[in-house]
């Protein structure tokens, strides 16, 4: 995917909530409230972020099973795993999935998340390529 893709505020916020919930052990509702307020989400963006974040958290077991089947890899870094959980939720369980947008945004979230975690650019590109491959198989 092009690095020129701009992440939607709703998906960026949902990704942050998923990371805080699973990586830091935060309560999802508290993480969501703080993240949505910090991002200034309102209206449709707020509703989309809520649906994606809570959905990805609620479907973790199913998503993790699918990831294990599709990934063919035992260890997955936190940035890629959160992007996969979010992308799979949107692809598999959303009422109106926008498949291309879901994959594209998950790929960009994995890249941005890996860079934010301090990974070198090459590893961030590898994480985004991995997420793209797994979601295309889904």
Model regions and ranges:
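Class I Rossmann-like S-adenosyl-L-methionine
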Residues: 1-138
